[in-house]
Amino acid sequence: MLPLLLGLLGPAACWALGPTPGPGSSELRSAFSAARTTPLEGTSEMAVTFDKVYVNIGGDFDVATGQFRCRVPGAYFFSFTAGKAPHKSLSVMLVRNRDEVQALAFDEQRRPGARRAASQSAMLQLDYGDTVWLRLHGAPQYALGAPGATFSGYLVYADADADAPARGPPAPPEPRSAFSAARTRSLVGSDAGPGPRHQPLAFDTEFVNIGGDFDAAAGVFRCRLPGAYFFSFTLGKLPRKTLSVKLMKNRDEVQAMIYDDGASRRREMQSQSVMLALRRGDAVWLLSHDHDGYGAYSNHGKYITFSGFLVYPDLAPAAPPGLGASELL
């Protein structure tokens, strides 16, 4: 079953699911991936429902309502992609429980015949009974195109009390490190003013910080457990500004980037993801081009997100540490 799941969810899911759980732990597995293949127009604030299910391990996703209901408390990674209908804007929110908006996918480009898509992802800490779903903005100028959307989620780390064995000696603690954060303020580059340039992109909202390895105010993740990590980030584009954001390792090692120099006055979004092998002390952060004409857009809907988590810890002896804080910038 696991190979089928990995094939259907794609590379990100393969990385995130990690090692196969041991005997007796099948009840702690929870993963889903679903798709909507038909358009949907906004007429009232509504949940996005789905007509195709690729994976539903644990049966925690209800395709008819479009809701995932948490059965195993823990940290979950969610990702979704929504297609935009021609002549319409796109606004799809990741919602927890009744009305807690966690992140947003948005595109207001309304050129005739334009078919586009926007993606978003976030890791959330869920309790038993929490629900997570997608909501399409209810105003008539918003709509999903065809194909409409995909929505996936999976348990990365079960809470410690959830995965404790019922019998036998306690298992050694599982190496864990994960974070997910958002920024609710836009960022505008400027050539004026004093102060250091090329600072990490800071965040003001923290969804998850397992292990305490991410400093939201500084915008830096520092590796505590050597191993393979998955990182994803999404940013909104300011109208008439160039979007240029790089995923950095340590001081000047560019790992991945997103870029859009379109002159449109409409707000749009871009996403990127990558897997990195990190040593203890390595720093990972986002760098926004800090000059006139550049910028990134966000608001309370949380357009800007940044997530990362340990997939596989190293089994070999630890390598020398990476850069210290004073050497990063």
Curated annotation (Swiss-Prot):
Its main location: secreted. Keywords: Cytokine, Repeat, Secreted, Signal. InterPro entries: C1q_dom, Cerebellin_Synaptic_Org, Tumour_necrosis_fac-like_dom. Pfam families: C1q. One of its GO terms (molecular function) is cytokine activity. Residues 164-195 are annotated as: Disordered. PANTHER family: CEREBELLIN-RELATED (PTHR22923), COMPLEMENT C1Q TUMOR NECROSIS FACTOR-RELATED PROTEIN 4 (PTHR22923:SF118). This is Complement C1q tumor necrosis factor-related protein 4. It comes from Homo sapiens (Human). The gene is C1QTNF4.
